[in-house]
UniProtKB/Swiss-Prot annotation:
InterPro entries membership: ADAM_Cys-rich (IPR006586), Disintegrin_CS (IPR018358), Disintegrin_dom (IPR001762), Disintegrin_dom_sf (IPR036436), EGF-like_dom (IPR000742), MetalloPept_cat_dom_sf (IPR024079), Peptidase_M12B (IPR001590), Peptidase_M12B_N (IPR002870)
Molecular function, one GO term: zinc ion binding
Annotated compartments: Membrane
Entry annotated with the keyword Cell inner membrane: no
Membrane association type: Single-pass type I membrane protein
Identification of the protein by name: Disintegrin and metalloproteinase domain-containing protein 33
Length: 813
């Protein structure tokens, strides 16, 4: 009798129950239930007391830096942690709502938090992101193939935080969400959760980077899923922000959280299972928020599940735009890194990044996390942005997008007392290079945040080798037609805030208007989609195709996701219609859709763009004409409508500039060279009150430019006199009509040697004098026959030893 495995009674039922427990719950994403890990008790290693461990049960303050010892699978690990000092911006606030619906705004110390980043000693490719608010929780990555998650066990709510568990990320299964409508029908929709973001080096104060001032909102459903615990909900948002910061650092973008908000009583904007409707309702609410609390981007994190497998949505290239700088994401994972990866992905779309096509992500394999802009969210812990994403980001910045990211968080906002060592230069500090143990700044004393002897500065784009750059040194070049340059002031180490041309300023040689710092034109948008050979289709294409109100031609969607047909006057603001070109690397996941219309008895091809099903749900606005695009004389596209805009603010500003300058986004004059701000009505160097002085330290250069402007008109006359003086054998004669060569004073019959630098010299004539009066004839040099013929000049012959001509004595006046 053969051996057969024994099967316990009820096994099928137990397996079914187990699958039901492990099957993903919409909106939760990560499999619910306890995944067994290895018990571990991490300990702080106190500075000054080597290897004396302190249990987490003991009260320990939240140090700026510290070491944590723990064991994972029999291996001793020493975590080198540093508080993320720049996570919360100066002036950071927290908002929730009381029972009466009134907002309650708190301004906690923006440096007193418990969110860390770091590495594992002895593992060069490691990275760590930890929260130490209640026990310890977070990701520990040793290498591409070894990632762990640490968390308290028993879970939060218990008063015993001394016991934790650590497990490999491969043990955790997660929901494989995509950007399409496809619902999984089997376990193929499940995937292992790999390791997380890539490690980064110590922050370099002098390195130029962008700053994303972020505002995060938790909706009412998320508050309920956190058991109505306000502190737990806020900590969830802070953990997400810490991960988003880690991910965006790979693009040289630093997150500064300006505020978080929890909708404790009810949703302040409509939140439904329709991602599109939820997004536009939130963006409408966000406009009111921005007026009270300026920020660069607002992100809504919801506890609801969107229809299908959608986990996030954001407008393409919406960053810094009043109507579209934001996004929505579902909190689809038990672990905060899942929501953070989705949020970073949607922020990427706001920055003009599309999904990575196949073969684009070579920086990280899928099993080790992949890249952030992957179309599917089956790998919720991506390591980096791909080279394709970086290329798209550079293109976005080159055309003027994301102008608001150039400005660091406003240090003038009300903040708690300064804390030396937090990485922010605050009131009373000359510099701040972070905690003293790791400060390597040669310009700054870490212990008291003061400059070293002889140092003028320590940080900033206008600081080099501890010295301020001179006033007028360029610190930020203009990016695109609608940007303006900024210059060092000579008194500050920081470049002045970025400003750009005021909305409505003409750009692209008059074919467009500046809008939010960019110059959107149909030509530029066609070439972005279909390459350099593409151009806008005739207006008839827009009129016919966009009147259909379908996926191929429309003026956007309503709150229910239905396509809207374009009215006749709005046709140029719907789906972009082009001709020529081919798919561009800057717009993967887009396929051309050609339509044919009849125009003047001929067939005309109109090319639109349609997103592939795998890309369309979290990319809002793909293939549509960008806001601010010119659609008629003094008319621009706004909210898919062609609206007349008198640009009255621009006209008022230009009037004040006396026709000698342009207007910037602060409604101040940016003067042309030769005119001085603020009103461009007096001589000066150009620039504006906001740009910093334009070469103010180089007065000689300015005087030289003014001198040249006077002397340049005289150069032709001076050149003529020189030529007449140097021409071979040229007797110049004064006559009633000017000056001409005298044949008697000419050189060889065949002219100069053909290889001489002068080549063939042609006779030159000058017209009458400036006064119009003829010059008096000189009887000695007139053309009348002379009774005393001149002595003949010697013949000129080329020098066989040199490639030059022997020049005769010059003719004089």
């Amino acid at each position: 009798m053969g051996w057969r495995p024994r099967r316990a009674r009820g096994t099928p039922l137990l397996l079914l129950l187990l699958l039901l427990l492990l099957w993903p719950v919409p909106g939760a994403g990560v499999l619910q239930g306890h995944i067994p890990g290895q018990p571990v008790t991490p300990h702080w290693v106190l500075d000054g007391q080597p290897w004396r461990t302190v249990s987490l049960e003991e009260p320990v303050s939240k140090p700026d830096m510290g070491l944590v010892a723990l064991e994972a699978e029999g291996q001793e690990l020493l975590l080198e942690l540093e508080k993320n000092h720049r996570l919360l911006a100066p002036g950071y606030i927290e908002t929730h709502y009381g029972p009466d619906g009134q907002p309650v705004v708190l301004a906690p110390n923006h440096t007193d938090h418990c969110h860390y980043q770091g590495r594992v000693r002895g593992f060069p490719d490691s990275w760590v992101v930890l929260c130490t608010c209640s026990g310890m929780s977070g990701l520990i990555t040793l290498s591409r193939n070894a990632s762990y998650y640490l968390r308290p066990w028993p879970p939060r709510g218990s008063k015993d935080f001394s016991t934790h568990e650590i497990f490999r990320m491969e043990q955790l299964l997660t929901w494989k969400g995509t950007c399409g409508h496809r619902d999984p029908g089997n376990k193929a929709g499940m995937t292992s959760l790999p390791g997380g973001p890539q490690s980064r080096g110590r922050r370099e104060a002098r390195r130029t980077r962008k700053y994303l001032e972020l505002y995060i909102v938790a909706d009412h459903t998320l508050f309920l899923t956190r058991h109505r615990n306000l502190n737990h909900t806020k900590q969830r948002l802070l953990e997400v922000a810490n991960y988003v910061d880690q991910l965006l650092r790979t693009l040289d973008i630093q997150v500064a959280l300006t505020g978080l908000e929890v909708w404790t009583e009810r949703d302040r904007s409509r939140v439904t299972q329709d991602a599109n409707a939820t997004l536009w309702a939130f963006l409408q609410w966000r406009r009111g928020l921005w007026a009270q609390r300026p920020h660069d981007s607002a992100q809504l994190l919801t506890g609801r599940a969107f229809q299908g497998a959608t986990v996030g949505l954001a407008p393409v290239e919406g960053m810094c735009r009043a109507e579209s700088s934001g996004g929505v994401s579902t909190d689809h994972s038990e672990l905060p890194i899942g929501a953070a990866a989705t949020m970073a992905h949607e922020i990427g779309h706001s920055l003009g990044l599309s999904h990575d096509p196949d073969g684009c992500c070579v920086e990280a394999a899928a099993e080790s996390g992949g890249c952030v802009m992957a179309a599917a969210t089956g790998h919720p812990f991506p390591r980096v942005f791909s080279a394709c994403s970086r290329r798209q980001l550079r293109a976005f910045f080159r055309k003027g997008g994301g102008a608001c990211l150039s400005n660091a968080p406003d240090p003038g906002l009300p903040v708690p007392p300064a804390l030396c060592g937090n990485g922010f230069v605050e009131a009373g500090e000359e510099c701040d290079c972070g905690p003293g143990q790791e400060c390597r700044d040669l310009c700054c004393f870490a212990h008291n945040c003061s400059l070293r002897p002889g140092a003028q500065c320590a940080h900033g784009d206008c600081c080099v080798r501890c010295l301020l750059k001179p006033a007028g040194a360029l610190c930020r070049q203009a990016m695109g037609d609608c940007d303006l340059p900024e210059f060092c002031t000579g008194t500050s180490s920081h470049c002045p805030p970025d400003v750009y041309l005021l909305d409505g300023s003409p750009c692209a040689r008059g074919s467009g208007y500046c809008w939010d710092g960019a110059c959107p034109t149909l030509e530029q948008q066609c070439q972005q989609l279909w390459g350099p050979g593409s151009h806008p289709a005739p207006e008839a294409c827009f009129q016919v195709v966009n009147s259909a109100g379908d996926a191929h031609g429309n003026c956007g969607q309503d709150s229910e996701g239905h396509f809207l047909p374009c009215a006749g006057r709005d046709a140029l603001c719907g789906k972009l219609q082009c001709q020529g070109g081919k798919p561009s690397l800057l717009a993967p996941h887009m396929v051309p859709v050609d339509s044919t219309v009849h125009l003047d008895g001929q067939e005309v091809t109109c090319r639109g763009a349609l997103a592939l099903p795998s890309a369309q749900l979290d990319l809002l606005g793909l293939g549509l004409v960008e806001p601010g695009t010119q659609c008629g004389p003094r008319m621009v596209c706004q909210s898919r409508r062609c609206r007349k805009n008198a640009f009255q603010e621009l006209q008022r500003c230009l009037t004040a500039c006396h026709s000698h300058g342009v207007c910037n986004s602060n409604h101040n004059c940016h003067c042309a060279p030769g005119w001085a701000p603020p009103f461009c009505d007096k001589p000066g160097f150009g620039g504006s009150m906001d740009s910093g002085p334009v070469q103010a330290e180089n007065h000689d250069t300015f005087l030289l430019a003014m001198l040249l402007s006077v002397l340049l008109p005289l150069l032709p006359g001076a050149g003529l006199a020189w030529c007449c003086y140097r021409l071979p054998g040229a007797h110049l004669q004064r006559c009633s009509w000017g000056c001409r060569r005298d044949p008697a004073c000419s050189g060889p019959k065949d002219g100069p040697h053909r290889d001489h630098p002068l080549g063939g010299v042609h006779p030159m004539e000058l017209g009458p004098t400036a006064t119009g009066q003829p010059w008096p004839l000189d009887p000695e040099n007139s053309h009348e026959p002379s009774s005393h013929p001149e002595k003949p000049l010697p013949a000129v012959s080329p020098d066989p030893q040199a490639d030059q001509v022997q020049m005769p004595r010059s003719c004089l006046w």
